[in-house]
Amino acid sequence: MSKALYIDYQKCTGCRLCELVCSVSHDGISNPARSRIRVMKWEAEGLYVPMSCQQCQDAPCKLVCPVKAISRDEEMGRVFVDYDVCIGCRSCIGACPFGAMSFNLKEKKVFKCDLCDGTPQCVRFCEVKAVDFIDVDEVSVIKKRSAAKRLSVAGKEASGLEARLHR
């Protein structure tokens, strides 16, 4: 069964340790610009959202790659870049709807989350467990529960509004 990163942004404290661990584990340097996961900050709201490749089923990055350097590893459930084939054209960067691909100016190649070959270091080092690596089916169940909860709240609000309108 394939696994996926699951981000619970409500747990994220914005410490950015995931970014540092990622860059060190991939490139041997502590540089958030080289991280495959980025923490987006909305400080006024106190909201921090770790973002990384969503490993899309119909990955736009894969579809636009002119040399087929991006493919899907079905066993691991990830989309990955073959760096020996990548020509650094950056078409995939523009195609990614999540902004999850970056470009290494030195190597002239794109880079993205590769799930650390099955042991994501961001998960291992996230002390608040805002980032987890769980079965795809479990992610689906969590998303369904979340959507049902939002619909329930919206339904209750709509019922209350309707009751006030018909007084």
Question: Model segments located where?
Answer:
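Generic N-terminal amphipathic, Lys/Arg-enriched alpha-helix
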Residues: M1-I7
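Flanking helices and flexible, charged tails adjoining ferredoxin-like Fe-S electron-transfer domains
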Residues: S2, R34-S35, M40-V67, Y83-R167
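A positional/architectural concept
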Residues: R16-V24, G28-S30, S35-W42
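Membrane-helix exit/interface motif
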Residues: A69-S71
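Mid-length scaffold segments of soluble, non-membrane domains
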Residues: E74-E75, G99
